[in-house]
A protein has these predicted regions:
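Short, solvent-exposed turn/loop segments enriched in Gly/Ser/Thr/Pro and often Arg
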Residues: 94, 221, 266-267
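GST-like fold's C-terminal all-alpha helical module
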Residues: 153, 165-262
């Protein structure tokens, strides 16, 4: 009798445990299902956020209009557009044919100088035109968040060298080009003045690049602004071998695919311009103020 009582109790315990195990298993299944549902919702939310943050395909394909001719100033912008892989359509401004004086171009660039851009997707989604190469580089840097740092200290370094080029290297090298190559007569004083100043500026760059690969530390719009001018060192009466750090910098930039692509645009067409043609020389070198 005692044995039967013990067996009966054991059976009762087993029966009592069975529902508990079932309830635990069921609870686990419910928890797992809830986790899966939550994970799916999270993934869906992330997908929606990503979709919102990405511009539509149609919007991405709206090209920037680049008003351009192959000069050191024009190259700045074609290089930046290539580096950023921004879609653009090139609108040639043949400065030897007077395209820079056409009313439609003056509406974009009142200084009758290229480069200039029109961005159909400007601030607020409205088109914006920008002239002056330095201003365009800054605009594109802000637009893309590339090659123009947001950190104030780093950005200041980039701006220092960008403005150094705009106010120094570009104008002085341009005058060296003019008096060494295009002037109708040789003027020793002018040739020496600008050749020597370009030499001084190359020395400034060479010292700056002694302990860093790029002008502002990292590759930036400051380097893009300078490379076209330095690439023409022979025209400026310089020997790049006198500036080893500058030479290495130039070789590094000229090896970049985007720089190569940007500097190839329309070069062949520009090379066919006859710079001895009086009409061409008048358009480029003899302009005076125009009345409205």
């Amino acid at each position: 009798m005692a044995r039967r009582a013990v067996k009966a109790k054991s059976r009762a315990k087993v029966k009592a445990k069975a529902p508990r195990r079932g309830r635990v298993a069921s609870a686990r299944r419910v928890t797992a299902a809830k986790r899966k549902t939550a994970a799916k919702r999270k993934t869906a939310a992330k997908s929606k956020t990503a979709a919102k943050s990405k511009p539509s395909a149609a919007k991405r394909q709206r090209p920037i209009e680049l008003y351009y001719w192959p000069t050191p100033n024009g190259w700045k912008i074609s290089i930046m557009l290539e580096e950023c892989r921004l879609p653009y359509v090139m609108k040639p401004v043949n400065i030897a044919a007077g395209d820079q004086f056409k009313p439609e171009f003056l509406a974009i660039s009142p200084n009758n100088r290229m480069p200039a851009i029109v961005d159909p997707d400007g601030p607020g989604g409205r088109p914006i035109s920008v002239f002056e190469s330095g201003a365009i580089l800054q605009y594109l840097g802000r637009k893309t968040g590339r090659f123009y740092p947001s950190d104030e200290r780093a950005r200041t370094a980039v701006e220092e060298w960008l403005f150094w080029q705009m106010g120094g290297l570009g104008p002085m090298a341009g005058q060296a080009h003019h008096f060494r190559i295009y002037a109708p007569e040789r003027l020793p004083y002018a040739i020496d003045r600008y050749t020597n100043e370009v030499n001084r500026l190359y020395g400034v760059m060479n010292i700056r690049l002694k302990d860093r690969p790029f002008l502002a530390g990292k590759y930036s719009i400051a380097d893009m602004a300078c490379v076209g001018w330095v690439s023409r060192w022979e025209r400026q009466g310089q020997d790049i071998n006198d500036f080893p750090h500058l030479k290495l910098w130039l070789e590094t930039l000229m090896a970049r695919p985007a720089v190569q692509r940007g500097m190839k645009l329309r070069v062949e067409e520009a090379s066919q311009v006859d710079m001895k043609d009086p009409k061409v020389r008048s358009l480029l070198f003899a302009q005076r103020a125009r009345t409205a």
